[in-house]
């Protein structure tokens, strides 16, 4: 009985402590996968706004980076069609061109394309090369994809910081914060024409040439 009373006393002490600091005893809520923590989201947005301000003042360079691809299967956008009209995009799943690109709010772009699989090694090599040619501190905004958080990137981040290259990770499941997502939608929905998907040669040529404009 004495042991039970001692345990009960401990529970009351714990309750008293939490009540004293303003805590409430309530059921812990479940959060569906794919929804970022509100606290983390707010913190990251605040930090990103600070970086945006510094970039506008010319104190840093701020890029938003992401991967995408074009393929001969084609991209099917929305469009007006007359009744009985057969509007289509030529489609064949033969070739794919992967893209890693970075863009800032002044539309300065850096990136590369490859017909091979987009790997962490390729991204690391690209970022490492950039780190040698910086004129000011440069921040690259990334999502949390595994290729952005691999071991090699973790090992090189301290070295890149010394060269003036910094990585900023968005909160999970927040593509709306990455303006590179807009770039891909424009690429596939406006810049690429239906005839650009007919052959792999035309697809690759058009995609690469668009980045040179």
Name every feature range the model reports, one short phrase each.
Residues 1-213:
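Short functional hotspots at interaction and active-site rims
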